């Protein structure tokens, strides 16, 4: 089965509104065809509405970096999936290691978010990944499989087929370290095998799996050549228009 690549930037808590607007203006007319690749930027929630307006008519898709699992209520400071979808946003990133570590999000929280996002009409980008300690102990497969099983609990086969899963080894995020292409592919293969165990081969061959962790324009091509890697979730290299476009160059 042919899976369309998805290259997604994750800005985290960076940029001002004027910088975000300038970025969209710089990239929107220079992206490869969406027939070849999905080009996505994950931006702080404050910027999504003006970015969505500016990207009209272009190939650029947008992602929220988080959402809550309720659509309304007394949840001060949170953003609902329904409100995000109402802006025309296609994707919502959930389960990032920074959310798990700093905001104490659990697998159960992330699973609730996945269900709420699908119900609202967006697509989750579900993150998983292990610490350096887990990696060095040889327990990566066990750890990542556990995160996937918990994150997908109760989702339908159709939902999982449309899901994006991002494998990001925590020890390679923003550290300058990167997993070798072989390690990245092997662990993305673990993710795919876990999906197959839960939902069958057809679903596992449909789900798209990204690698994230210090991905750069000079390293992305080797990663994308691997069997189980269908895209990248990119932090630092997505912050500047030139480097984001360089990540997509092979698809032009």
Curated annotation (Swiss-Prot):
Residues that coordinate or bind substrate: 10-12, 174, 214, 235-236
Keyword Isomerase in annotation:
yes
Task: Provide one Gene Ontology biological process annotation.
Answer: glyceraldehyde-3-phosphate biosynthetic process
Q: Name one GO molecular function term.
A: triose-phosphate isomerase activity
Listed under GO cellular component are: cytosol
Write out the catalysed reaction: D-glyceraldehyde 3-phosphate = dihydroxyacetone phosphate
Enzyme Commission code(s) on record: 5.3.1.1
Q: Spell out the catalytic residues.
A: 96, 168
Localisation? Cytoplasm
User: Pfam families attached here?
Assistant: TIM
Pathway given for this chain reads: Carbohydrate biosynthesis; gluconeogenesis; Carbohydrate degradation; glycolysis; D-glyceraldehyde 3-phosphate from glycerone phosphate: step 1/1
Give the protein's biological function. Involved in the gluconeogenesis. Catalyzes stereospecifically the conversion of dihydroxyacetone phosphate (DHAP) to D-glyceraldehyde-3-phosphate (G3P).
Query: What quaternary structure, including any partners, is listed in this protein's UniProt entry?
Result: Homodimer.
Which PANTHER family does this chain map to? TRIOSEPHOSPHATE ISOMERASE
Q: Which family does it belong to?
A: Belongs to the triosephosphate isomerase family.
> This protein is called what?
Triosephosphate isomerase
Q: Which organism is it from?
A: Lactococcus lactis subsp. cremoris (strain MG1363)
Gene (name only): tpiA
């Amino acid at each position: 089965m042919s899976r369309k690549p998805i290259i997604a930037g994750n800005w985290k808590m960076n940029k001002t509104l004027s910088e975000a607007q300038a970025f969209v203006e710089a990239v929107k007319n220079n992206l490869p065809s969406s027939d070849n690749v999905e080009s996505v930027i994950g931006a702080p929630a404050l910027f999504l509405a003006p970015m969505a307006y500016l990207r009209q008519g272009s190939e650029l898709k947008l992602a929220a970096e988080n959402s809550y699992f309720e659509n309304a209520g007394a949840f001060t400071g949170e953003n609902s999936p329904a409100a995000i979808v109402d802006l025309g946003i296609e994707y919502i990133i959930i389960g990032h290691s920074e959310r798990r570590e700093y905001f104490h999000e659990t697998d159960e929280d992330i699973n609730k978010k996945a269900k709420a996002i699908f119900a609202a009409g967006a697509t989750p980008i579900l993150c998983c990944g292990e610490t350096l300690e887990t990696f060095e102990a040889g327990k990566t497969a066990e750890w990542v499989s556990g995160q996937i099983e918990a994150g997908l609990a109760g989702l339908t086969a159709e939902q999982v087929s449309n899901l994006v899963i991002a494998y990001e080894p925590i020890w390679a995020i923003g550290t300058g370290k990167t997993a070798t292409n072989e390690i990245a592919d092997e662990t993305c293969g673990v993710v795919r095998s876990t999906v197959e165990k839960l939902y069958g081969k057809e679903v596992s061959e449909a789900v798209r799996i990204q690698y994230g962790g210090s991905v750069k324009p000079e390293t992305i091509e080797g990663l994308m050549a691997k069997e189980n890697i269908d895209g990248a979730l990119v932090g630092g290299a997505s912050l500047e228009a030139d480097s984001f476009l360089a990540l997509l160059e092979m698809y032009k």
